[in-house]
From Swiss-Prot:
GO molecular function: NADP binding; shikimate 3-dehydrogenase (NADP+) activity
Catalytically driven reaction(s): shikimate + NADP(+) = 3-dehydroshikimate + NADPH + H(+)
Top EC category: oxidoreductase
Name of a matching Pfam family: SDH_C
Protein name: Shikimate dehydrogenase (NADP(+))
Length: 286
């Protein structure tokens, strides 16, 4: 039996600028079809100037949405403009998933959940580590740091060209996080069980600097939040050096699942068929 929200839960969105490149409509479209839901999920290009009005329309119901996703450059604005952000988004200062509840806009951030779910699927046992190295201190690194800290990783070393930005993250996320300059990379790699690239290095096939991963723990995992190309230069380097690697596509797929459940009432599964649909689309637009 459908609940009384049926007329509202049928239409969701992803809003960003630009947003034409988004693969979220493919992901949610796959799940809608699989469950036989008569709903929609569409991309909407919304400029920064227009975003507050877009949020107002969502709250008032004039936009016809039950909720949706927000992507660059609106994640911080979505957090600020929502009525009830949760603790995850509050610590990050950014939200990527919105839903209407009793006339209010609620908000969360599912990026970190997507990141660890990808590792859980592709590198079982990864969280038995004691130390991790995060390359980059931009917005993308926040959710990764939060998620692995909350999974119990005791030492998280953030390495960045501008160490001041890494120190800001250490101040935000507590004593488990340590800030370093790039010069410290060889030292902090020693014995670490997880290496995460959160920078744009290697995106779209661009070259990446050579990294000697040999000081990592023998069973360490190297992962990249970049998923175009699927196997980035950093992942190729790590694989050639004998380490387990996990591409970034699974993070994109898994972060989408909590929102779908909020809007449409069913928990979707990230399966190989969905993964192949997205890879096929990536190949088509390569």
């Amino acid at each position: 039996m459908r609940d009384s929200r049926e007329t509202f839960v049928n239409h969701a969105f992803v809003a960003g600028y630009p947003v034409k490149h988004s693969r979220s409509p493919l992901i949610h479209g796959y799940w809608l079809k699989r469950f036989g839901i008569q709903g929609s999920y569409r991309a909407h290009e919304v400029t920064s100037d227009a975003f507050p009005d877009f949020m107002r329309q969502i709250k008032e119901g004039t936009a016809g949405f039950c909720g949706g996703n927000v992507t660059i450059p609106h994640k911080e604005a979505a957090f600020r403009l929502s009525d009830r952000p949760d603790e995850l988004s509050a610590e990050l200062g950014a939200a990527n998933t919105l839903w209407l509840e009793n006339g209010t806009i609620r908000a969360t951030n599912t990026d970190g959940r997507g990141f660890v779910a990808n590792l859980d699927e592709r590198a079982k046992g990864w969280d038995r580590i004691s130390a991790a190295v995060i390359l980059g201190a931009g917005g993308a690194s926040r959710a990764v740091i939060q998620a692995i800290r909350d999974r119990g990783v005791k030492a998280i070393h953030v390495v960045n060209r501008t160490p001041e930005r890494a120190r800001e993250l250490a101040d935000r996320f507590g004593s488990a996080v340590h800030a370093h300059s790039m010069a410290a990379l060889p030292e902090v790699l020693s014995g670490a069980g997880l290496f995460v690239n959160t920078t744009s290095l290697g995106m779209d096939g661009e070259p990446a600097p050579a990294i000697d991963f040999s000081k990592l723990a023998r069973d360490a995992v190297v992962t990249d939040i970049v998923y175009v190309p699927l196997k980035t230069p950093l992942l190729r380097q790590a694989e050639e050096q004998g380490f387990r690697v996990v591409d970034g596509l699974g993070m994109l797929l898994h972060q989408a699942a909590p929102g779908f459940e909020k809007w449409f009432g069913l928990r979707p599964v990230v399966d190989e068929a969905l993964r192949e649909i997205i890879i096929s689309d990536m190949d088509k637009h390569a």
